[in-house]
Amino acid sequence: MVAIFLIAGLAQAHEGEQAPMKRRQQGILTGMPFMANLAPRTFVDDLDRKIYLAKAPIRIVSLAPSITEVLYAIGSSEELVGVTQYCDYPPEARLKPKVGYTHPNLESIMALQPDLVLAPREFLRADFLGKLEQLKIPAFILDAKTIEDVLSHIQTLGRMLGRSASADGLAAQMRQRITEIKTRTATLPHPRLLYVLNSEPLITVGPGSFIHQLIVLAGGTNIARRARSAYPRLNMEEVLKEDPELIVFPVGLVEGIPESEQQVWQRWTTLSAVKRGRFFRISSDLVNRPGPRIVEGLEIFARIIHPEAFEDKIKP
């Protein structure tokens, strides 16, 4: 738990030297009874840590592209004062000060005087989180494993940042689109699909990953559906046995499978996907980032798997 005290009644003479710390501390309470009249709000993150906010934060650092996309989508871009070097959507996010990614720069974060740091669990180091706690900088950790987690995070951030109306509206729109896509594909066959997350070694997605859930929602059968991990390794014997009818490669400037590695799959001539030329590409940003555009990724998966259900076809 990050316990930060809101100090009241500071003498006017100390206002200057206390200003940076006060900006971080403003709105963060301990929930003590004598402060109950401020009606603090409690938020529990995906590490089961609690933070208490009396008002919406006004200086936020985002440590993930997906989180940055959520903040822009719900109208909190003005409060966003720091991002990672991979926060590139929407384009104006590139103009925000950078604080690192897998190894965030603590000094850069401190210089921005944030009153909230939003971070993904994936790359978060315990020592880094401990340093934030020592500095009394509140951090809220997000770890989306399902589409519902993504929607829940959007609504939680909306409540936290005073953007409930826009966040709830966004989540409702996303749920409606998901329902529409499921309805289109519900009665259709479920072709076998391999999603190549990494080539060497061959890594795909399994139960426990939201990309697996996207494949299922789109009407496909993930050949790694029996895997015991969210991102299992496969050998070619397993792939040949499952015989995928579709092979999908993520592509992008940062994450993705290079064209040369995609072409290597042509050698496996007994695979149904190779025989029929059913190789497809999908933007890694749409499916690897658990943010608002995940529904766009779902629709592309659905168009790949069931082109007959859509007027606009996606060509291999």
What do these predicted ranges mean?
Residues 1-9:
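Bacterial N-terminal signal peptides
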Residues 49-50, 59, 116, 126-203, ...:
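Extracytoplasmic substrate-binding proteins
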Residues 44-48, 97-107, 227-236:
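Short helix-initiation/N-cap motifs at beta->coil->alpha
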Residues 57, 104-122, 137, 235-252:
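Proline-aspartate-enriched helix->loop->beta-strand connector
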Residues 84, 208-231, 251, 280-281:
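His/Asp/Glu-enriched short active-site or ligand-binding loop at hydrolase and phosphoryl-transfer sites
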